Structure formats: C-alpha cells, structure tokens
C-alpha cells in the first residue's frame, strides 16, 4: 500500500518535466488553486482507500502516483492506494460492496459499477462537469457507466487492445500488413504457423485480452449474447459461424493458450515465441525499454482489429471505470479526486506517462501529445471511439457485467476450440448460464 506525501510528489515529478506539462512546484500550486475552486471540497480529515488494477506500464503508475500525491498535498486528504491483478479487482470490490467496508474507491475493469448499482455513489455531477469542460464523453465509455440517466461511475480511460505483431514475420508470411478482414486474417495466421512464427490469443480467463478478442469474433459474425430487449439470442447461426471460425483460427496458435491469463501473451511475445497477438501497448513499451530487446522493439508494430462479415468495427475494448462506494465517509473527497484525475493539467501528463497504454474517454483529448509522440502509439488513440459497450447491443447493467465477469463467452469459445465440448453443447452451456442471469 502506498501512503503519499508532498515529498514523494516533488521528488517524483521531475521525470515528466521535459514533456512541458506542469510538474513539481508548478503542479502543486495549480492543484492547490484547483482544490480551492473545485465544486467538491474534501471533508476535514478525509482519508480515502483506493484500489486500482496493477499497472502494466511503470511510467503510468509513476504518473498516477504523482497525481495522487498532488491531490493529497492540495486537499489534505490522506490517500492509501493499493493494486490488485486484473483477475482480483472485481472479487475484492464485490467483498467491499457486500460488507460495506474496506474501500472508498475502486478503479476496475469493464462494467464494474454495474455489478452493484445500489452500492455506489452517483456521479452525475462529476460526469456533467467533466463532459461539458472537455468536449463530451465517447459513446461506449459513457454507456459503460450509466444506468438510465444515472452515472454509477466515471470512465477514466480505455486500455486499448489491438493487434501486436512482428513485422518481419508478417512479411516473411507474404503480407505487407495485417489483413483487415476475417478471411485474410485467418490466411495470415495459417502462414505464420507454417513458418514456425505462430500467432496466439488467450482462451483462458484473461479478463482483458480473452474477453476482447472472443467478443470481437462473436460480434464480427453478427452473434450476440442478448438482443436490444435483453432476450438471450446466443443460440444462433451467427454464433455457429463465429465458433467455427475461431476453431480454425485456434488451430494455428502457439501451444498453451487455453491456460493463458492477461500476462501470458506479453511474456511469450517478449521471449520471441509469439509473433502476433492482441494486447495493449505494454508489449511494445517493455521491449522499447529493454536495451537487450532493441531489435524486437523495432520489429514490433500495431494494427486495428480486422472487420468481420458484418462490415463494421466490433471491438470490445477494456474500459477502466472508477467508482465510489456510497458507504464512504468522504463523498466530497471521493468526487473531488475523480474530477481531479481527469483535469487537463493532470490527465495529459498521465496519458503521456502511460505512453499509449491508456486511451482518453473525453473527446477534447484527441489532440493529447501522447498520440504523436511515437507513430506506433497512434492506433491506440482510436480505442474509445471504435468500441462497443461490453453489453454488445443489449442493455448495459448488472446482468451484462455479470456475463463478462463470469467469462461466459470466453468459456463458450474455449470449450469448443479445446475439444471439451462440441459446438452445440458449447452454445447450450452458455445459453443456460445467460438465461439464469437474464431471467
């Protein structure tokens, strides 16, 4: 757990001075002025316990910690921050929601606020303040956090996931770039396998990567878990086609993907064993920062997700919303901190620190410096705009959030691709589970 002081803030802020963003004393002075004029005044003696997902990019974590320290220095709020793996964030947030204690704020994944809508502090005032000031929210991000007209949380950012590939392997396979249709993408993966430079995508319980690529395939074929009225429609010809396509694709993969979590493909790619996968920008950053992997970094490129038979993007990107529990003793401090995070003086520096790992959800940040700092970052600037909400065409809410958290779509594909079940049984299992959720 990190307990932040002004000393750690001033000491740590110098690293980003070269970006032109406010740092050091200048940022502290701005933060203090912001706190005095903020619509939300932190309660006297406020102390916030904040859980966040464990960082994949060190510079992002550093920029976040500097922001936390600035908030503490400016408002006097004691900030205790700790990190958990992607897989552990939702269970630990659920424990806090059920017990009414342990956390004030939880920064999690996908539709986390929708899992316990009656346990969160409504954020309409924060959402309106930020939206009006910074050009409005991207559609999928807003939908992720809303129940009707109620904002259950704030979509801080999107962890964009796109195709990460070795250019040399693609070219050796006879392709100049990643094909932007499903048929061509399958041909590429077959050619990569033939050259012993395989692709690999997780079929295990990888909260970010597995949900992302398997929903992309399902939606790209026109298959969905539920329709616009939340009627379960997973048992369809479109789902059949999606499963068959995925099975063919999985036969080209590197061994072991059935047990992969969210860090497995990072490790395999950086070890030189994997040549195409879906991931955030973290693989490229890790290679770029390691002098021993200079050649790997230069050979690593990114591409948009190919478009499926329905002819339009069907991306499930990893929204990372933050929520405040309604049992917090410090609601004003909670709202103030969330608003503080997304102010330009903080947010653009934070995005630069994240180096493309985080994508903005407020339209004004389309011009943030991070997107032109490195040409390989640019693809990730599109993540919040090309995404569908995690509910697909259904209603975002607790039921859709439960289906994501329980890996129903992931397990359906994994059951068929690994041979644990045939096609019909794989769908039937998912259908039964969905009907229990949506009854």
Labelled PLM ranges:
Residues 1-20:
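N-terminal secretory signal peptides and thylakoid transit peptides that target proteins
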Residues 42, 73, 78, 171, ...:
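Conserved C-terminal helix/tail region of periplasmic/extracytoplasmic solute-binding proteins
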Residues 66-137, 146, 168-180, 268, ...:
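Extracytoplasmic "Venus flytrap"/periplasmic binding protein-like
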Residues 189-192, 229-258, 301:
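Glycine-centered hinge/linker elements that transmit conformational signals in sensory
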């Amino acid at each position: 757990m990190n307990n932040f002081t002004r000393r750690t803030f001033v000491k740590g802020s110098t690293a980003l001075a070269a970006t032109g963003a406010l740092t050091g004393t200048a940022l502290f002075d701005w933060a203090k002025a912001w706190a005095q004029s903020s619509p939300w005044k932190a309660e006297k003696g406020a102390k916030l316990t904040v859980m966040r997902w464990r960082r994949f990019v060190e510079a992002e974590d550093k920029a976040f910690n500097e922001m936390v320290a600035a908030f503490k220095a400016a408002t006097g709020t004691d900030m205790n921050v700790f990190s958990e793996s992607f897989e552990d964030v939702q269970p630990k947030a659920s424990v806090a929601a059920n017990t009414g204690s342990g956390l004030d704020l939880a920064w999690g994944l996908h539709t986390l606020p929708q899992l316990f809508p009656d346990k969160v502090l409504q954020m309409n005032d924060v959402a309106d303040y930020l939206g009006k000031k910074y050009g409005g929210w991207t559609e999928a991000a807003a939908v992720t956090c809303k129940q009707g007209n109620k904002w259950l949380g704030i979509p801080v950012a999107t962890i964009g996931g796109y195709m990460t590939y070795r250019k040399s392997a693609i070219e050796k396979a006879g392709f100049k770039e990643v094909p932007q249709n499903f048929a061509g993408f399958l041909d590429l993966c077959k050619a990569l396998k033939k050259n012993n430079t395989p692709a690999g995508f997780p079929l295990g319980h990888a909260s970010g990567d597995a949900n992302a690529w398997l929903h992309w395939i399902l939606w790209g074929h026109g298959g969905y878990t539920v329709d616009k009225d939340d009627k379960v429609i997973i048992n369809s010809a479109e789902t059949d086609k999606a499963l068959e396509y995925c099975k063919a694709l999985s036969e080209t993969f590197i061994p072991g993907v059935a047990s992969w979590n969210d860090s497995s493909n990072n490790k395999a790619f950086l070890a030189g064993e994997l040549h195409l996968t879906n991931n955030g920008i973290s693989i490229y950053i890790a290679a770029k920062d390691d002098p021993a992997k200079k050649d790997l970094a230069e050979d690593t490129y990114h591409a948009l997700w190919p478009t499926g038979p329905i002819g339009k993007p069907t991306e499930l990107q990893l929204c990372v919303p933050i929520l405040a529990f309604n049992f917090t003793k410090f609601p004003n401090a909670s709202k103030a901190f969330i608003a503080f995070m997304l102010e330009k003086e903080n947010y653009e520096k934070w995005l630069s620190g994240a180096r493309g790992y985080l994508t903005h959800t407020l339209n004004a940040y389309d011009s943030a410096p991070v997107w032109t700092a490195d040409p390989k970052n640019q693809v990730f600037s599109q993540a919040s705009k090309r995404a569908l909400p995690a509910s697909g065409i259904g209603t975002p809410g607790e039921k859709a959030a439960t289906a994501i958290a329980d890996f129903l779509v992931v397990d359906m594909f994994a059951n068929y691709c690994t041979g644990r079940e045939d096609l019909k049984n794989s769908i039937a299992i998912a259908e039964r589970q969905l009907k229990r959720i949506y009854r």
